[in-house]
């Protein structure tokens, strides 16, 4: 979910 994109920072 959206949290996955956050983890890519």
From Swiss-Prot:
Disulfide bonds: none annotated. One of its GO terms (biological process) is neuropeptide signaling pathway. One of its GO terms (cellular component) is extracellular region. The modification Leucine amide is found at residue 9. Its main location: secreted. It is found in: Secreted. Keywords: Amidation, Neuropeptide, Secreted. FMRFamides and FMRFamide-like peptides are neuropeptides. Belongs to the FARP (FMRF amide related peptide) family. This is Extended FMRFamide-3. It comes from Striatophasma naukluftense.
